[in-house]
Every structure is written in C-alpha cells, then in structure tokens.
C-alpha cells in the first residue's frame, strides 16, 4: 500500500483546498486566495515541540486531528494540486512549508523543481532553519527555482523563543541559529527577498516586537506578521488572543519599518513597553489601509500573493489580517481599534 507522504503528497491549507475545488465552500466577503500554501507531510510528523504550534510533538491530538495556523490542512497528491492550479489565474505564487524532518530538505528541492517545470507560478519556501547548516542548501533552493524564502522565528525575544520553542520545551530550535540562517538566506537570495514570521501575543511587549521587526529590516528581511491563535490540544490552548489594539499598533509599526518610513528607534513606548508614539503623523498611513492587510511574499502584480484568507482569525471577525484592501468602513473600525 502506497504511503501518502512527501514529495508525492503534500498538505494544503483549507483556503487552497476550497480554491482548487477539492472541497466546496465560499469565502467571507468574497476574498480570493492568491497564493497556494503547501505543507510537507510525513508519518513521523515534525520533531519540533513548539508550545503554540499545531504540528508540535507535544500536542495532545492524533495526527489526523491536527490543525496548523488555526485551520485543517488536508492531504492531496502534488500532481493533482498542480493540475488544478493551472486553471486558476488568481493564483500567483506557491509556498512550500518545510517541517523539521530528516527528509524535508531533499524533498523540498524535488518539489521546487517539479513546480517550476510544470507551472509558471513563483515559488517560495518556508524553511526549517534547524535543518540548514550551510549556505549551499539555500543556494540549491534558488538554483532549483525558488525566488524567496521565509523563516518562522515566531517569538519576538530570545527568552520567549527558548521558553516556547527551544530548550525550555525540549525542542531542537535555537534562537541564534535562526538569525544566522536569516543572514545566510539574505546572502543567497538578496536583501528583502527573505521574510521572517513573527507572532504577536506570545508574551512579548510591543517594544520588543518592534525591535525584532527592526532587526529583520536591518538584516535585509521583511516581516510577515501573525496574531497568536490558540491551537486546540497544544500547551497554549488556554491562552487568549492578543488585544486587537496591540495587534493594530504592531501592524502599523511593521509597515513603517518595512517601508523604510521610520524606525523602531523613533517610536516611543510607555513603561510597560506599549507603543504610544510612532514618531510621525499616522493619519494618512491608517487611511490607505494597506498596513493592515496580510503581509507576505508578492505575486506577479507586486502585491501580496500569500494573503491567507482567514488563516489568522475566524471570518466572524474582527478581521486581523485583511486578505483584501480594507473598505472605508473597515478603516474607521481600525482607527477605533488602535486606541491612540
């Protein structure tokens, strides 16, 4: 009996499954997915023990009950995904998410080559830094056809990283190594062809998160921002979502830093690390709406392709990462939510 594992099989996000017609359903407010997210799959799973992650070894559910970034990730043949994607002009990019598994690097290279041979889609890779020990591995991804990579640092500080992903949970990941791999990736792919993932709400202050975003920017990596959502069965299932006002402020801070309009040094924080002054007038920035959209790798049009509709919150709202340009009424809500 054939094992349904990578590279022949991959998991897709629920949004991708709906868009490709594997499942029936529609998107709230007619949102359209622009980037396919694929996840490597092995029977042994991921060796990480990250306390907030749906794929964690420490999660108290069976493999078939696992979600990742809030939603189900059904398993399909890679070839069938490719065939269905060919007829979807709205899809601009595909991102391959590695997991920490001995075969992941080899299989990722195979999947990149297949995608570049059989489609005209741009290819990104969300890499597992713990498996990367030399720049050559990243150069191989670029030669295979990937044009961008992402690195999920997730936690905004060394202390939180160790506590939730590293030695504090018996996990294999190391903060310094992750940042070393960010530098390797920038060298291999070029400045700002690399993204770091950061999750707001793991216990950091707004000042600490702004500093992490700035560190990425200084290194040559853009930030792709997520809001913590508790995964059922994970050690952090009982933790609350970060307050919406906190997330909105960090979204705007990220935009200012990544668009090179200002820096974390120019921003002011109170004694609790809460952002109270962006160092500039923010009215016009809030009005354009774009700072509050999902941040991710771009598509053919130069706009975000990895827009992950409702992968960060329930469609019933409030929307944290807008998968489309916010409407005027959304902007008014955002202004009220920011509490500045």
Language-model features and meaning:
Residues 106-125, 170-192, 241-266:
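Alpha-helix-loop-beta-strand connector modules within alpha/beta enzyme cores
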Residues 85-88, 115, 141, 185, ...:
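Generic structural signal for hydrophobic
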Residues 133-144, 200-218:
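Catalytic cores of alpha/beta
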Residues 124, 128-131, 168, 181-207, ...:
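Conserved strand-turn element in the central/C-terminal portion of the radical SAM core barrel
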Residues 57-105, 120-137, 141, 146-179, ...:
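Core AdoMet radical
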Residues 92-114, 201-208:
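Conserved glycine-rich "GG(E/T)P / GGGxP" loop and the immediately following alpha-helix
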Residues 1-36, 188, 210-340:
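Auxiliary Fe-S-binding modules of radical SAM enzymes
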Residues 16-59, 93-96, 148:
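N-terminal pre-triad scaffold of radical SAM enzymes
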């Amino acid at each position: 009996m054939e094992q349904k594992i990578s590279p022949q099989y991959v998991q897709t996000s629920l949004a991708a499954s709906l868009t490709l017609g594997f499942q029936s359903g529609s998107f709230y407010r007619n949102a359209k997915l622009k980037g396919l997210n694929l996840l490597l799959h092995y029977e042994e799973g991921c060796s990480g023990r990250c306390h907030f992650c749906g794929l964690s070894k420490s999660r108290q559910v069976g493999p078939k009950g696992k979600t990742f970034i809030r939603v189900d990730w059904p398993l399909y043949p890679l070839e069938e995904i490719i065939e269905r994607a060919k007829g979807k002009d709205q899809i601009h990019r595909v991102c391959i998410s590695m997991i920490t598994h001995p075969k992941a690097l080899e299989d990722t290279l195979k999947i990149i080559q297949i995608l570049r041979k059989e489609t005209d889609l741009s290819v990104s890779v969300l890499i597992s830094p713990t498996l990367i020990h030399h720049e050559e591995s990243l150069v191989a991804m670029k030669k295979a056809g990937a044009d961008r990579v992402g690195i999920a640092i997730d936690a905004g500080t060394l202390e939180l990283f160790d506590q939730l992903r590293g030695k504090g949970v018996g996990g294999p990941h190391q903060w310094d190594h992750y940042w070393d791999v960010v530098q390797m990736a920038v060298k291999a792919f070029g400045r700002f062809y690399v993204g770091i993932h950061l999750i707001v709400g793991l216990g950091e202050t707004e000042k600490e998160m702004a500093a992490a975003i700035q560190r990425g920017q200084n290194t040559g990596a853009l930030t792709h921002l997520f809001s913590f959502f508790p995964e059922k069965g994970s050690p952090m299932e009982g933790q609350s979502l970060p307050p919406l006002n906190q997330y909105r402020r960090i979204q705007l801070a990220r935009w200012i830093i990544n668009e090179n309009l200002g820096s974390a040094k120019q921003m002011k924080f109170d004694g609790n690390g809460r952002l109270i002054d962006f160092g500039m007038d923010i009215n016009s920035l809030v009005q354009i709406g774009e700072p509050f959209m999902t941040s991710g790798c771009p598509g053919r049009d130069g706009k975000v392709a990895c827009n992950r509709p409702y992968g960060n919150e329930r469609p019933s709202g409030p929307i944290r990462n807008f998968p489309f340009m916010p409407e005027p009424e959304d902007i008014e809500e955002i202004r009220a939510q920011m509490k500045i």
